[in-house]
Amino acid sequence: MSFIDPYQHIIVEHQYSHKFTVVVLRATKVTKGTFGDMLDTPDPYVELFISTTPDSRKRTRHFNNDINPVWNETFEFILDPNQENVLEITLMDANYVMDETLGTATFPVSSMKVGEKKEVPFIFNQVTEMILEMSLEVCSCPDLRFSMALCDQEKTFRRQRKENIKENMKKLLGPKKSEGLYSTRDVPVVAILGSGGGFRAMVGFSGVMKALYESGILDCATYVAGLSGSTWYMSTLYSHPDFPEKGPEEINEELMKNVSHNPLLLLTPQKVKRYVESLWKKKSSGQPVTFTDIFGMLIGETLIQNRMSTTLSSLKEKVSAARCPLPLFTCLHVKPDVSELMFADWVEFSPYEIGMAKYGTFMTPDLFGSKFFMGTVVKKYEENPLHFLMGVWGSAFSILFNRVLGVSGSQNKGSTMEEELENITAKHIVSNDSSDSDDEAQGPKGTENEDAEREYQNDNQASWVHRMLMALVSDSALFNTREGRAGKEHNFMLGLNLNTSYPLSPLRDFSPQDSFDDDELDAAVADPDEFERIYEPLDVKSKKIHVVDSGLTFNLPYPLILRPQRGVDLIISFDFSARPSDTSPPFKELLLAEKWAKMNKLPFPKIDPYVFDREGLKECYVFKPKNPDVEKDCPTIIHFVLANINFRKYKAPGVLRETKEEKEIADFDIFDDPESPFSTFNFQYPNQAFKRLHDLMYFNTLNNIDVIKDAIVESIEYRRQNPSRCSVSLSNVEARKFFNKEFLSKPTAESI
């Protein structure tokens, strides 16, 4: 039976750009004028400039003492055909002190027809003739992928992974409980989620992953999604050369050793100088640099110090042949002067793609950070290393950099990051200054001479390095401000048309039985204005976008997993978020995720916060759709919270602690400990603290393996009873307007 992916046939509207190619061929009789020619023979070069496009200025090399230069150099401009695009041509003479303009000319690109190619002469000073060859064509193959569907690589992964999971589930559940697994259509999609929470989340998630690996649950999962601190563990695990052949146990031993050191040891003058100088190369190439870059280097040096050149793209090798779950990471795009709780676009990262589902725009990971215009790369840079992305994914800590390093004057050492961030909005994080202009380090006119250019760059570098060093290691105003510490990247959606918005669940006939009523949607979980502006579009005119830690809106990466294209049946989430005390209700982040899902018309089981009053604090809670016959697309959620309950009595599930030492090692609080060993701001974990938190979550996970297995069995049966779970009947789809005409001619369609 062949399956059709209906999301593949949804039209994500975008306007095609034009590629304008200019070949600077040659010039004859270049002159500086009668008197100027008597003093010096011209050293000509040509500058091309179109103000309406990024990467707008191009230039040829120069020739010494040549009045009839032949360049034969080709340049490309990506243009918006709706703009009045004018090419400015400037003939220049290179000098040591100040370059001299010999003449200028203009050419209206609108005078060219698409598909046309011609040579055009330009006359300067009534003597010099320059010949340019110009051509104009449509960019029919943009570098962005415009689609609501998953990319082909992920679809291939899912097919392979289902084959593997089918056998793994039979082994996990035994022949009786897995008898419903007749084909891959019966295989449920299981996703594992890890929250933010700094090193507390990272260490806790390391224990979780060890338990899931050893129990066989990880072999039955399709996705592992992380946010902030959990992404740091995922990065450590997936970048390790021995994973997945080697399990988390040995890798966690390495991690424990790495986080036992004080992070201030990474801020020796020699190391900081090396960090900053390496970033100068990035800045001088035209890429934005913020404190997030430096924080990413510190995180990388701590966790993946021998793998600093690893990239996100390189992790594709780990999921080849679907040997392990596909890792998904996330951050937020935010706007200046708008609280991230009011507006934030979720950006998803996988080894295959980076993009925003809200706009149906995706790119390969090696293009993230490159300069785009209308969906086409106009300037490509090297792929950002994984440690830079780790800094972006956990950038809340670069915002409060001084607290992380322990040099803050604050006496409230027990306060959580969440408490400190309550009064921070995007306007404190995002610098809304003139840096939106292109950042290429450009010398003044006259630096064409290589020695002068080198001297100019060295002076600039020395000044910049000095400022950054002073900001890091002194109590300067720059060090104590939060402004400008968000990650900053070139806007990959610059120049696109966002007149049409796309719901995150475009094919779903959202019925009133499983939706929120108005009172529920109006009820605030954390803030009266939460999610108030989530339907607003991104600013496609801004040259830069700011990306921050997703935990600044809510601390669980549900938006990645709730995309209906992924068809997740069972979500196992682990919440390491800070709470006021160990006995506080643990559902704040889950309730925010629920509200976000309902506002985006995505199925989500009803979260009953009063279960805490009825049943008290537990290691995990199960939330199911109340009416499975109606809520056919609604996943089941097993929600683990950070709690030390049974671990105090048992050293393994069913095995009591007996000795005094065994009891003492497990007798600890997480949020009520006055020493705050598990504070969100703690970036040094002595071996005992690491083992306590790691072993606690290892135990909690293993102690509830039967809960997970039972949910998997129910998901298999649910799949069998609802074979059309991922199918779409066009007659029931409200979003028919999004389909192309060819697809609408089909009577029905089913997805994979």
Swiss-Prot record:
One of its GO terms (biological process) is arachidonate metabolic process. In brain tissue, expressed in low levels in olfactory mitral and granule cells, in hippocampal pyramidal cells and in dentate and cerebellar granule cells. Interacts with KAT5. Residues 1-178 are annotated as: Phospholipid binding. The N-terminal C2 domain associates with lipid membranes upon calcium binding. It modulates enzyme activity by presenting the active site to its substrate in response to elevations of cytosolic calcium. In the presence of phosphoinositides, regulates phospholipase A2 and lysophospholipase activities in a calcium-independent way. Induction: Levels of rat CPLA2 are increased in dentate granule cells during ischemia. Phosphorylated at both Ser-505 and Ser-727 in response to mitogenic stimuli. InterPro entries: Acyl_Trfase/lysoPLipase, C2_cPLA2, C2_dom, C2_domain_sf, LysoPLipase_cat_dom. There is a cross-link at residues 541, 606 (Glycyl lysine isopeptide (Lys-Gly) (interchain with G-Cter in SUMO2)). It catalyses: a 1,2-diacyl-sn-glycero-3-phosphocholine + H2O = a 1-acyl-sn-glycero-3-phosphocholine + a fatty acid + H(+); a 1-O-alkyl-2-acyl-sn-glycero-3-phosphocholine + H2O = a 1-O-alkyl-sn-glycero-3-phosphocholine + a fatty acid + H(+); a 1-acyl-sn-glycero-3-phosphocholine + H2O = sn-glycerol 3-phosphocholine + a fatty acid + H(+); 1-hexadecanoyl-2-(5Z,8Z,11Z,14Z-eicosatetraenoyl)-sn-glycero-3-phosphocholine + H2O = 1-hexadecanoyl-sn-glycero-3-phosphocholine + (5Z,8Z,11Z,14Z)-eicosatetraenoate + H(+). It is an enzyme of class 3 (hydrolase). Its EC number is 3.1.1.4, 3.1.1.5. One of its GO terms (cellular component) is zymogen granule. Residues 6-122 form the C2 domain. Has primarily calcium-dependent phospholipase and lysophospholipase activities, with a major role in membrane lipid remodeling and biosynthesis of lipid mediators of the inflammatory response. Plays an important role in embryo implantation and parturition through its ability to trigger prostanoid production. Preferentially hydrolyzes the ester bond of the fatty acyl group attached at sn-2 position of phospholipids (phospholipase A2 activity). The active site is at residues 228, 549. SUPFAM superfamilies: C2 domain (Calcium/lipid-binding domain, CaLB) (SSF49562), FabD/lysophospholipase-like (SSF52151). It is found in: Cytoplasm; Golgi apparatus membrane; Nucleus envelope. One of its GO terms (molecular function) is phosphatidylinositol-4-phosphate binding. Activated by cytosolic calcium, which is necessary for binding to membrane lipids. Activated by phosphorylation in response to mitogenic stimuli. Ca(2+) 1 binds at residues 40-41, 43, 65. It comes from Rattus norvegicus. This is Cytosolic phospholipase A2. It comes from the Eukaryota.
